[in-house]
Each structure stands twice: as structure tokens, then as C-alpha cells.
């Protein structure tokens, strides 16, 4: 068994096991730039917060999936179980002022734990890190302002100690936001820790996880 992770573009990912398809933070094309429409079947759509343009376009999923909002989950200590998976979230904030709540959803599929950093806009405290410490895969919002500054992101990664970091939410010529490129984050890592994957899909299983943190850069599928 393995978990297939596809970076669709911006903050959107499709996570697939043999029996389940989870869509994370789908955007609304063409309103976000030149990213193509997502239009993919899903069993669950999980969003970090409500922002239909960039993070919560429910209609990007084909079919009749369950809809989960990470902000709701963050208010439930046990989260919600759906399709045999326990979905939880940590409440964080969209800016250093900590005035607009967002969330970082986390869950485990096929033995691989995953956390999506949503629209995180600040450095993380030890209490905020605790529920996701040691997560296998961290989907990291990387483009800097208006989201978390890259130095604060690196500090958070050092606290979380994920096995794999997959950058997202950065400027790659497709998004119509003023974001920084992924190279700003990569410059803070040893080049030996960085993999530029040729495909937008990455297959991960508990037996293939690296011993130490690696950054895996995926091209967008859309």
C-alpha cells in the first residue's frame, strides 16, 4: 500500500489510496491565474478555511463528496471520522496579528500522516506544533507575505521535524498573487536535502519515508 500525493497547484492537493480520494484546498479556475480547472473525483473535500477563490472551491470536486472545513475540525478535539479516517485540525491565524482564524488540517492515510498548512500567516508556537510534531508529510505554504515569512516557516519545520516537506502556495508564474518563489525556502536547506521530482505525483509509504527531513519539489499538475 502507498499514498499517492498530487500537487494540483497553489494550495490544492489530491491524496489517493486504493479506496479513498481526498481533495485539499481546491481553487477556482480561472480566477486564480493560469492554473487549469481541477475537476477531479473525490470522496472527501477538506479545506483549511473558507476562501472560495483560492482555498475552498467545493465545486472543483466531481461527484458528491463529504465536505469538511478545518476550522470546524479545530473546535473538535477528536475531529471527525469519515471513510475510516480521523480528520483533525489545528487552529492558526492568517497573519501575525492573529485576528483571522484559519486551520492546518491533519490526518493519516495508509499509515502516512499528513498536515496541510493552509493559509498559515505566522510562526508557530510549541503548543501549535505539538499535535503535528513528527508528521510524515508537511504541505508547506512557501510564498512568504501575505502568508508565513519563510524564516518563520523554516523554524516551524525545524520544530515539526517532518519526514517530507512539499512546498505549495508560491509564485511559479501561474498564480495571480504577489508571492515569492520556492527558491526562497530552498535556500535555507542543505542542497543534499532537496529533491526536484519530475512528476506532480509522489508515492509515499511508511517503508519509503526518509530518516531525516527532505524537501520534495513537485511541478503542478494543473
Model-predicted regions and their roles:
Residues 1-18, 70-73, 79, 90, ...:
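Zn-dependent metallo-beta-lactamase
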Residues 4-7, 21-25, 84-93, 104-106, ...:
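Active-site-proximal beta-strand elements of phosphoester/diester hydrolases
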Residues 6-8, 99, 164-222:
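Binuclear metal-ion centers of metallo-dependent hydrolases, dominated by the metallo-beta-lactamase
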Residues 7, 57-90, 155-168, 187, ...:
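P-loop/Walker A phosphate-binding loop and immediately adjacent motor/lid segment at beta-alpha junctions
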Residues 12-77, 88-100, 120-131:
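Pre-active-site segment of Zn-dependent metallo-hydrolases
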Residues 42-43, 136, 163:
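Conserved acidic residues
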Residues 93-160, 177:
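Active-site-proximal loop/helix segments of hydrolase catalytic cores
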Amino acid at each position: 500500500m502507498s499514498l499517492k500525493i498530487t500537487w494540483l497547484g497553489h494550495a490544492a492537493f489530491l491524496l489517493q489510496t486504493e479506496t479513498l480520494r481526498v481533495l485539499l484546498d481546491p481553487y477556482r479556475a480561472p480566477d486564480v491565474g493560469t492554473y487549469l480547472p481541477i475537476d477531479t473525483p473525490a470522496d472527501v473535500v477538506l479545506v483549511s478555511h473558507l476562501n472560495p477563490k483560492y482555498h475552498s472551491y467545493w465545486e472543483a470536486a466531481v461527484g458528491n463528496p463529504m465536505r469538511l472545513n478545518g476550522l470546524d475540525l479545530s473546535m473538535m478535539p477528536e475531529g471527525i471520522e469519515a471513510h475510516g479516517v480521523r480528520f483533525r485540525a489545528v487552529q492558526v491565524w492568517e497573519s501575525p496579528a492573529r485576528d483571522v482564524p484559519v486551520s492546518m488540517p491533519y490526518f493519516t492515510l495508509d499509515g502516512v500522516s499528513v498536515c496541510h498548512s493552509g493559509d498559515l500567516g505566522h510562526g508557530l508556537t510549541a503548543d501549535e506544533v505539538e499535535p503535528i510534531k513528527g508528521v510524515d508529510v508537511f504541505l508547506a505554504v512557501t510564498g512568504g507575505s501575505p502568508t508565513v515569512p519563510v524564516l518563520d516557516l523554516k523554524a516551524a519545520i525545524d520544530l515539526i521535524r517532518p519526514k517530507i516537506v512539499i512546498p505549495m502556495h508560491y509564485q511559479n508564474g501561474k498564480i495571480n498573487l504577489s508571492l515569492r518563489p520556492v527558491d526562497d525556502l530552498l535556500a535555507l536547506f542543505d542542497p543534499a536535502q532537496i529533491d526536484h521530482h519530475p512528476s506532480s505525483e509522489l508515492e509515499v509509504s511508511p517503508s519509503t519515508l526518509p530518516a531525516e527531513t527532505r524537501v520534495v519539489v513537485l511541478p503542478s499538475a494543473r
